[in-house]
Amino acid sequence: MTKVSSLGYPRLGENREWKKLIEAYWAGKVSKNDLFAGAKELRLDFLKKQLNAGLDLIPVGDFSLYDHILDLSVQFNIIPKRFAKEPIDIDLYFAIARGNKENVASSMKKWFNTNYHYIVPEWSKQRPKLNNNRLLDLYLEAREVVGDKAKPVITGPITYVALSTGVEDFTAAVKSLLPLYKQVFTELVKAGASYIQVDEPIFVTDEGKDYLQAAKAVYAYFAKEVPDAKFIFQTYFEGLIDSQVLSQLPVDAFGLDFVYGLEENLEAIKTGAFKGKEIFAGVIDGRNIWSSDFVKTSALLETIEEQSAALTIQPSCSLLHVPVTTKNETDLDPVLRNGLAFADEKLTEVKRLAEHLDGREDPAYDLHIAHFDALQAADFRNVKLEDLSRVATKRPSDFAKRRDIQQEKLHLPLLPTTTIGSFPQSREIRRTRLAWKRGDISDAEYKQFIQAEIERWIRIQEDLDLDVLVHGEFERVDMVEFFGQKLAGFTTTKFGWVQSYGSRAVKPPIIYGDVQHLEPITVEETVYAQSLTDRPVKGMLTGPITITNWSFERTDIPRDQLFNQIGLAIKDEIKLLENAGIAIIQVDEAALREGLPLRKSKQKAYLDDAVHAFHIATSSVKDETQIHTHMCYSKFDEIIDAIRALDADVISIETSRSHGDIIESFETAVYPLGIGLGVYDIHSPRVPTKEEVVANIERPLRQLSPTQFWVNPDCGLKTRQEPETIAALKVLVAATKEVRQKLGN
């Protein structure tokens, strides 16, 4: 019989119970005991759901109260030096992730090319030790519910160290962890663990080539020291970087991604690289929400089965990246809904595929195929769109000329101050929006409320003496979902939440058909805000690449076509804003770097397509219209040429948590356009000191001209509280004025 498994399950819960529990603890509304009890209740519920889905191996250790990499850091005593004197408890754990009054938070980076963020481990000569065997505790807890189906899951030592910062000697760092992993594994085996899943996704990246010898040594050590353990060497998000070497590791099974790494991994299977090994085949897309093509997938599984000692079917990666279930999405078009598969439905899919492979007939298998075919044939996927050959893809003049024209119009001071776009969304805002959605208040009442918030924050910004203002985005729940509600080809869900970082959950829209601009999206609120002040107010849009990367995108057409469709829609909205007198328009490409393929050989094509779509969106404006863009946490050195090629008049970049790493990208490369490198971290409630912000302004000015530098927070301020937001912006403005004075002298 073919087995079925999973790599990980969503933490949030069907109604975001996980998020609400953690935030209640942060707010002091529940005790530590309540937090731990609530977390256990959720864990056990998730285990039972997977047991009832018919899984043969159920992941344990994927659950976290913030981030699974942070869990390892605290477990292995890789605690940042600035927190070293604090007791090792849950409050320290959250402080490392979020910061506190005394110390800044650790860096946060994207988990490979997903929209999930992990807390970067900081090495600073700590002595690794096992503070607790958390995985053993969770395994013993799980055995009470699922018995011997419990499968411990842990990120492997090579990936963990590769994702760290401050590592002076990679080999020494890995070696220092091996006795700790050995103890964890030994205790798990003694407790009855059959399989142990060790995640090593670094080996699907180009960087993984540098660690092949380390992999040989590490897994030889585990095989010798824990001989009774059955290890699954698990990778995802791409194909193995070197299957010839890695397939020879002394492990029992290999978990491979046959969705995003299909070409390389299938070739390795066909050539017999994994002959005699168990294969855990990731054939269900764990990162997107479309139902699987059972016809193609069943044929693929037959090929894999022929070349493996034993086959287990599973999703391509952890289901952390998709919502929990479609069962509550009753408002969706039936053709669309029947073509979707969230986490629970994906578990059903792996079970049905296994039963079909074993020769068991099931009418549900054939019904699944019928639903899949109906979606592919739907009319909304075959719309005639604007001819791209008639669309401008280059600004009329170069940046130097545009800058002079824009400055003559805007009269901005040296080091202009601004924010990224959103302001705090209070409980009152959320409550009023919900009342409007339920029909408890009228459209007119809701509009009046939103306008009152806009006016209040315009006055706050004027009082703070910011130079370029924003309307605050109070009408938006999410920067991508908002546009998904307004464009043809998109739909939104009621409960389609996924974790982005910590307790931050997002509800990505679904791009199910061809995309078109239907009506003004942002014009009314932006024009109203501009009518209240003589200072420029930015129009706030989300760019085509970010909309795509932060949505559940359709996969039946090439990505560049989808980029271009959305670029055309954003172009139409930009033109409406420009015609309405808005002089500065920000087109956020927060997720440009996030979508970058993990392999360098695939990156140029993606970046070329991304730049082209941005040009489609922004190149039809006049020289006097200033185009801004914004980007989130990224390794920018590898995409600096693409950033320059966007030809945005000003780019703002999230930098403060990088502790200087991102700034170095712009210190070593000539960047001629306007730029704002975030001067304080908005992901932490901590208010920066003026001295910190002054330093964060002055450091990039060693390389960048003051005439091109803008001063702004790291990112939007929607998730912050109003008092801390105003306090931090006061510091930002005061620091900017101090630096201006120094420059003037």
Swiss-Prot record:
Instruction: State the EC number(s).
Output: 2.1.1.14
GO terms under biological process: 'de novo' L-methionine biosynthetic process; methylation
List the molecular function annotations (GO) for this entry.
5-methyltetrahydropteroyltriglutamate-homocysteine S-methyltransferase activity; zinc ion binding
Keyword terms:
Amino-acid biosynthesis, Metal-binding, Methionine biosynthesis, Methyltransferase, Repeat, Transferase, Zinc
The UniProt entry annotates the active site at 683 (proton donor)
Ranges in coiled-coil conformation: none
Q: Which coenzyme or cofactor does it need?
A: Zn(2+)
Pathway involvement?
Answer: Amino-acid biosynthesis; L-methionine biosynthesis via de novo pathway; L-methionine from L-homocysteine (MetE route): step 1/1
Residues binding 5-methyltetrahydropteroyltri-L-glutamate are 19, 115, 478, 501, 504-505, 550
Listed Pfam families: Meth_synt_1, Meth_synt_2
The entry assigns this protein to a family as follows: Belongs to the vitamin-B12 independent methionine synthase family.
Q: What is this protein called?
A: 5-methyltetrahydropteroyltriglutamate--homocysteine methyltransferase
Q: What is the lineage of its organism?
A: Bacteria, Bacillati, Bacillota, Bacilli, Lactobacillales
> Which gene codes for it?
metE
